[in-house]
Amino acid sequence: MKNLFIFLSLMMMFVLTACGGSKYDDAIDDVISQYKEHKGNDTEINIKRENAIVRVYEGGKYIQFAFYMPDNSSRELTTFKYYEKFGDKYEKMTDMPGNGENDRLGLSKKTPDYEEVKGEETELEE
């Protein structure tokens, strides 16, 4: 009986650990996939989540991201892209600043709900 309890406890810990991740994973993957389809393969930029800085605002309503440029580039990041959620779909926003600052929604002045750099979640200040 004691062994069964230990086994079940270990299995529960394994299941809970395997279910980790962000509640925004699907949304982030969706907008990066949309951008990749739009951009196509005609780019030197590695368009993958593991090569991006991603910020999620207002409970997932807005997603902002940029990709790290190749080492031989004069810039560190591409221009920032913004997507807004309408219903259950995200659409690319226009007329937003490429440097990620002073956008018309004031997102640059807010703390994101979620942020990751190169696929790793960052600690956000409250």
From Swiss-Prot:
InterPro entries: DUF4467. It comes from the Bacteria. Pfam families: DUF4467. Residues 1-27 form the signal peptide. Residues 93-126 are annotated as: Disordered. Keywords: Signal. This is Uncharacterized protein YddJ. The gene is yddJ.
